[in-house]
Amino acid sequence: TIWQGRFQTLSCKRKAFLTSQPVFFQQARLGKDHEEFWILKFCTMTNKKNDKGELLPDKDRITGLGNFLRNTSLDEFPGFWNVLKGEMSLIGPRPLPPRYLSRYSKDQDRRHEIKPGVIGWAQVNGRNAISWEEKFKLDVWYVDNKSFFLDIKILLLAVRQILLRKGIVPDDEDAMEEFMGTNIGD
């Protein structure tokens, strides 16, 4: 909508002015059939480091605007560019970094049988409040049950979840820990 476009423009200008950080964040992700692509998101954190040159924890790097963008899921809005390019769908398992590929069980890897999505079944069933294993089970369930009506349901649940701020990690906690692998579902 016109208002979303104006909000995006203002957010970008404000962020660039206040933080002198890049407005966009790009990261390699895996899509359907393990095809690698670059996902685009709004940058929500600084690159602050400790004395050893290591990045500080997420909670110490997230900006005020970044916190708002994450809590409202607006940081994902640039991902629609990936949808327009055909790398992602609106609905599907959230794309993850390529480094995770060797860590998936055979069953978990089935999440790559379809295009990843901006919104996923796992996100509307717990978002960051559930374990990696639970997310992957939900992703595979979606792969097996994908339908137009399920996608509509996910879209409506996502809007509800954003409005009610359900499944969002509190500001004083890091988001998800890195997925290190599992033996479930081999």
Residue ranges with predicted function:
Residues T1-D186:
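Conserved small/aromatic sequence motifs within transmembrane helices
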